[in-house]
């Protein structure tokens, strides 16, 4: 996902975290964005305009009446050029001025003139942030359509411990990507995605599971959220970072996955069953650790609920997309799953193809639909996720 052709305007105000915005500017440039920076006069006490000019290739604006530039009405030209404005760190002073329409420097003037999406990342002492005046000002900005990125908690520059830290750079960038990187062609579509493995306990120490890492399902959830969908991510235990802009529903067992999916199914428009749900579980779970003994051990297993087998025949308006992982007869087995479970589409994965399968960042998939099959080349799981969403948009006529 990139920002080619997009202009990001960074508004840097006078907080100790101002220096962190140099890394944000650099990262945005690597994503292809055209980055402009406006600093308040106080911000120049923490980091120099030259730093941003070197990183962005543009003059860093500070003084509203600066004459050292090609003549334009600068506050209007920057306001029109920007696809998104991020004010970070946003001090209590700048937040108060923006909330009340005060435009007494270049930054607040541009913010007032701009019609693009505006993001604000407060960063200040905990007492200042939690002061009712600041909270009212943030609420006012939200009423006017600003997006407030919540501060993080931790040790602050003043040595206090509490909220008020500037969010991590990757969080700020993720908010920018979510705002402008992709057209919102899935706006209003309610999507549920399952991802990762399940774990079926044998005793208090051991469980049955599989090799799924959840990467494919998480990629689908992130891509759908970036395109404006209302996404619920139902996932088993994984080592992945949560997907922002989604409802996160962690589960452990196949039974819990079944309950989480079926309870939400009526209010779902599209369901992606990308999770590797256990087909079997131990018939009984021992209360204590099973001790090693001489000879073999036999573990009786029982079937877990068949989620797609249950909801497939009951679907009304929903689009059901299953996933299959095969080691042979990929198309035949996946086509049988499509028909048996009344699915609209199956994304079939061949575990034996190089670059596909568990734990890797690439995949090779085949789309199985009632109309036939379409094999995709090796690509990143992020690109596979977008290809899946494009296919569903086409088939649903969204």
Can you say where each PLM-predicted feature lies in the sequence?
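A cross-family phosphate/adenosyl-ligand binding-site feature
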Residues: 1-119, 125-398
């Amino acid at each position: 996902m990139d920002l080619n052709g997009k202009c990001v305007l960074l508004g840097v105000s006078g907080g100790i975290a101002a220096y962190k915005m140099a890394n944000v500017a650099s990262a945005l440039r690597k994503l292809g964005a055209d980055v402009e920076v406006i600093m308040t006069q106080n911000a120049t006490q923490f980091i120099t305009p030259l730093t941003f000019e070197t990183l962005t290739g543009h003059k860093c604006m500070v003084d509203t009446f600066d004459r050292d530039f090609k003549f334009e009405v600068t506050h209007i030209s920057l306001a029109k050029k920007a696809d998104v404005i991020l004010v970070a760190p946003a001090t209590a002073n700048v937040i108060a001025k923006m909330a009340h329409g005060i435009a007494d420097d270049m930054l607040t003037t541009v913010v007032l003139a701009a019609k693009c999406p505006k993001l604000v990342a407060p960063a200040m002492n905990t007492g200042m942030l939690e002061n009712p005046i600041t909270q009212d000002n943030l609420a006012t900005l939200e009423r006017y359509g600003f997006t407030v990125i919540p501060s993080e908690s931790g040790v602050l520059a003043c040595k206090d411990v509490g909220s008020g830290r500037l969010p991590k750079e990757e969080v700020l960038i993720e908010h920018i990507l979510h705002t402008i990187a992709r057209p919102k062609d899935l706006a209003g579509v309610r999507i549920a995605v399952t991802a990762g493995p399940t774990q079926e306990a044998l005793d208090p120490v051991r469980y049955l599971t599989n090799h799924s890492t959840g990467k494919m399902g998480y990629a689908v959830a992130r891509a759908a959220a970036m395109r404006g969908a209302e996404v619920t991510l139902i996932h088993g235990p994984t080592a992945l970072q949560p997907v922002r802009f989604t409802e996160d529903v962690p589960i452990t067992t196949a039974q819990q996955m079944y309950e989480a999916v079926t309870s939400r199914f009526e209010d779902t428009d599209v369901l992606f069953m990308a999770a590797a749900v256990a087909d079997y579980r131990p018939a009984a779970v021992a209360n204590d650790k099973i001790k090693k003994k001489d000879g073999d051990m036999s573990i009786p297993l029982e079937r877990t609920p068949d989620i797609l087998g249950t909801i497939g025949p009951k679907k009304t308006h929903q689009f059901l997309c299953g996933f299959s992982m095969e080691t042979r007869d990929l198309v035949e087995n996946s086509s049988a799953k499509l028909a048996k479970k009344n699915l609209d589409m199956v994304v079939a994965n061949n575990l034996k193809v190089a670059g596909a399968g568990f734990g890797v960042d690439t995949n090779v998939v085949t789309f199985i639909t009632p109309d036939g099959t379409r094999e995709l080349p090796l690509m990143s799981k992020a690109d596979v996720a977008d290809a899946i969403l494009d296919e569903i948009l086409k088939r649903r006529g969204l």
